[in-house]
A protein has these predicted regions:
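Short, basic/aromatic recognition patches
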Residues: 2-19
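Zn2+-dependent cytidine deaminase-like catalytic core
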Residues: 39-137
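Iron-sulfur (Fe-S) cluster-binding modules
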Residues: 140
Length: 140
């Protein structure tokens, strides 16, 4: 799947975002090594701490399908966002989402694909989370 095709799926997911408080809508499309796509959107809550990001929604969807238990590694995620769903800038993942990615992904190969509506950029997880803490740090 091309980065642009994955980005289009993220844009579609953004249409489902529930953001009545901030108005900032985000969509994500997660690709695993089998070619399966898992979409997510942000879902806000009046108790702000209960809000969940689009990226984590996509990862939780991936996990609940059993893909994690079957060892199907995520290989890329496209993320798009903007106020009222209008894309004007890049929407990089927050720190919590980066940490979730670190749990399940190879930081050197997993790609984060972003757009500002004019250009598409791609980064590895290691580039956006240098010195990331992951499961390998807990190995005995």
């Amino acid at each position: 799947m091309t980065p642009n095709a994955l980005m289009e799926l993220a844009k579609d997911a953004m249409l489902r975002a529930y953001a009545p408080y901030s108005g900032y809508k985000v969509g994500a499309a997660l690709l695993d090594e089998s070619g399966q796509i898992y979409r997510g959107c942000n879902v806000e809550n009046a108790s702000y701490g209960a809000t969940i990001c689009a990226e984590r929604t996509a990862f939780m969807y991936w996990a609940q399908t059993g893909a994690a238990m079957r060892g199907r590694k995520p290989v890329a995620i496209a993320i798009v966002g903007g106020k009222d769903g209008v894309i004007t800038d890049f929407a990089p993942p927050c720190g919590i989402c980066r940490q979730v990615m670190m749990e399940f992904c190879d930081p050197d190969t997993f790609r984060i694909i972003l757009t500002n509506g004019k250009e598409v950029r791609s980064y590895t997880l290691a580039e956006i989370l240098p010195l990331g803490f992951g499961p390998s740090h807990l190995d005995e």
